[in-house]
């Protein structure tokens, strides 16, 4: 099996910065810079108020048809410069603009109004709400919270897919003698040493068979983020080389006489808890993925996970 999986390749290319002694310092350093607080995306002036929700909707439609990103930011109460510089802002704006031309539906929800856009009725994150004085405006903070929540969900779905791909990549790796030592073994590292095939990933220009993690990435920007220790889709990863007492068979190392032949594992945890993800995931050779919410101490707890050992607080991820 060959996995041409960009996600798995990205987490592996970033792994050189996440293994061993470099991990703790880098985690603490980048956690402070991953995302500013939601308030920093808000404009100094609040979003404009309207006498009726219909007026607010017409203002939204007019702004979108005019193609002015700054005016949309003002209508939603956002800092235009910071909103425009965020990842995917231009593409998202174009998609919303196109969707508004297809269809725009107004739905009542929780005492306010939600704009559903396009044929797929994508809900605009910023709801229309009524103030105590009877005026209507787009709720900036609620919209930013919703965007963050949606991103968490998307990141977690992507991470589960990547973890599944990791299991397949390890089995692929062990199907051949990759390092020429006469032993069929699993990879103890995500990224191979220079000129070697001792990890799940090696660059295609190195020659020989394609690595189990797939070809080198075309998306250089995403690759650089992974290399900088920013993770992939909000998550960091580490190979686990043993299992604990909560697992059938008890405590033992997967590495025997220097070769990882007794199994393999992986842990994936959010770069910034509550912002890029909530759940932490672990998997072993069985392919059954477990998840747990480790709370505000997620980074500290995940740094110490070296063995596959899900306990009572861990649940099996549903298919």
Region annotations inferred by a language model:
Residues 1-11:
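Bacterial N-terminal signal peptides that target proteins for export
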Residues 11-22:
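Bacterial N-terminal signal peptides
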Residues 77-125, 226, 230-233, 238, ...:
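Surface-exposed, charged secondary-structure patches
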Residues 113-116, 120-157, 161-164, 288-292:
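Short beta-strand edge/turn micro-motifs at domain boundaries
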Residues 173-275:
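Flexible, glycine-rich surface segments
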């Amino acid at each position: 099996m060959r996995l041409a999986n960009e996600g798995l390749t990205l987490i592996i290319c970033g792994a050189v910065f996440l293994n061993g002694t470099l991990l703790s310092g880098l985690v603490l350093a980048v956690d402070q810079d991953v995302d500013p607080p939601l308030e920093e995306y808000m404009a100094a002036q609040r979003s404009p108020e309207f006498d009726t929700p219909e007026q607010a909707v017409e203002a939204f439609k007019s702004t979108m048809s005019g193609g002015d990103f700054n005016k949309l930011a003002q209508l939603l109460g956002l800092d235009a410069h910071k909103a425009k510089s965020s990842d995917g802002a231009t593409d998202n704006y174009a998609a919303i603009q196109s969707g508004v031309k297809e269809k725009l539906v107004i739905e009542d929800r929780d005492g306010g109004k939600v704009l559903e856009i396009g044929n797929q009725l994508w809900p605009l994150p910023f709801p229309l709400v009524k103030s105590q004085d009877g005026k209507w405006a787009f709720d900036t903070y609620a919209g930013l919270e919703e965007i963050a929540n949606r991103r968490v969900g998307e990141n977690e779905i992507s991470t589960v897919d990547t973890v599944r791909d990791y299991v397949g990549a390890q089995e692929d790796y062990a199907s051949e003698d990759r390092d020429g030592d006469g032993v069929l073994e699993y990879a103890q590292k995500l990224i191979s040493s220079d000129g070697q095939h001792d990890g799940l990933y090696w660059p295609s220009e190195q020659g020989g068979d394609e690595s189990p993690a797939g070809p080198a990435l075309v998306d250089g920007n995403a690759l650089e983020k992974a290399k900088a220790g920013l993770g992939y889709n909000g998550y960091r990863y580490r190979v686990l080389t043993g299992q604990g007492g909560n697992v059938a068979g008890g405590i033992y190392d997967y590495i025997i006489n220097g070769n990882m032949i007794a199994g393999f594992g992986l842990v994936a945890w959010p770069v910034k808890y509550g912002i890029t993800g909530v759940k932490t995931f672990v998997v072993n050779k069985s392919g059954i993925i477990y998840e747990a919410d480790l709370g505000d101490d997620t980074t500290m707890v995940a740094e110490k996970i070296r063995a596959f050992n899900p306990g009572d607080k861990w649940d099996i991820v549903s298919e």
